[in-house]
A protein has these predicted regions:
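Conserved PLP-enzyme active-site core in the AAT-like
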Residues: 2-280, 284-290, 295-302, 309-313, ...
């Protein structure tokens, strides 16, 4: 049964499986010196910007800690929303790997703003204080909300004014692009993002992410940081070949568009159910809502999904590229019984 617990629970898109099968037919050089990786790098440069530096890694936490290590020193602090993945869901890995203090900022919707960030921009040049060095943001956010280009530009402009850099966790950036009708470049390079964690695992890939470095001053150290962070794959082609397929014929966009459409269908149906209340706008493929606890407990007997805030009876439902209309219709039918 397909669940609504997480897009990490979804399968692998057939086009990605085909790419993996093709990459498996013969031997190839290791550590990224293969034709599959060369082609994937070319695709990424075509998609984002020609002079970017792509680095394929195993997972999202690995991509985040590499990006943050690149742009900070241990005496820096990293600013993020209090719901940020690096603060809540990475077991302290960013702190361990960077040595930096992480400073969470309260937000109503998971989105940072210059107004929320500015009170944390102090202590510069004071040896007694951690020096603000980086801003971490997620697109889409952990609450399913989406930054517009203007909102991103406002944050990167503020950060660069203070000599800081901005890292975007793009685990679900495809869903943001699909929702806004924008290209990957329009939400990253054109907005002044310094380093991107380009995700695909939640949108049809089997595994792997890609750290994409846009800031010229960070590129020379990137490969060394990846190796030190235990994220250099010997059989790199099995990571990289997926991204070639992912970026071919806009598979990334088609998958995300479908996931978003299924989220809207689910949201529209839930709005007609008495007792359901949404706690965040549904802008991507994540839904946050409350309903009577008895109904939640009953649905958990059939479906697997997560509490987001158990004290408030708030749950999260997530659609995927492989969510079907009948999955939603069945869920709603059981809920209405």
């Amino acid at each position: 049964m397909r669940s609504f617990a997480s897009d990490n629970n979804s399968g692998v898109h057939p086009a990605i499986m085909e790419a993996l099968t093709r990459a498996n037919r013969d031997h190839a050089l290791g550590y990224g010196d293969d034709l599959w990786t060369e082609e994937a790098v070319r695709k990424i440069k075509e998609t984002f910007v020609a002079d970017c530096e792509p680095l394929f890694v195993f997972n999202g936490t690995g991509s985040n800690v590499i990006a943050l290590q690149l742009m900070t020193r241990p005496y820096n602090s990293i600013l993020c929303a209090e719901t940020a993945h690096i603060y809540v869901d990475e077991c302290g890995s960013p702190v361990k790997m960077t040595g930096c203090q992480i400073r969470p900022i309260a937000t109503p919707d998971g989105k940072l703003t210059p107004q929320l960030i500015t009170p944390y921009l102090h202590g510069f040049a004071d040896q007694h204080h951690s020096q603000p060095g980086a801003i971490y943001l997620s697109e889409c956010t952990e609450l399913g909300t989406i930054y517009t280009p203007d909102e991103l530009k406002a944050i990167t402009s503020l950060a660069h004014q203070y000599g800081m850099r901005v890292h975007m966790d793009g685990a679900r950036i495809a869903n943001a692009c699909a929702s806004l009708g924008l290209s990957l470049r329009a939400l990253t390079v054109d907005c002044g993002i310094d380093v991107l964690s380009f995700g695909g695992t939640k949108n049809g890939l089997m595994m792997g992410e890609c750290v994409i470095v846009f800031d010229d001053s960070l590129k020379s150290e990137a490969r060394f940081i990846r190796k030190q962070s235990a994220q250099l794959a010997s059989k790199m082609r099995y990571l990289s070949c997926q991204f070639t397929a992912y970026l071919t014929d806009e598979l990334w966009l088609k998958n995300a568009t479908h996931a978003n459409a299924m989220a809207k269908r689910l949201a529209d149906a839930l709005e007609q159910v008495p007792g359901v209340r949404f706690t965040q706008k549904v802008e991507s493929n994540q839904l946050f809502l409350t309903m009577p606890r008895a109904e939640t407990d009953r649905m958990l007997q059939t479906y697997f999904f997560y509490f987001w805030n158990e004290e408030a009876d708030e749950i999260r439902l997530v659609t995927s590229f492989d969510t079907m209309e009948e999955d939603i219709d069945t869920f709603i039918r059981i809920l209405k019984k």
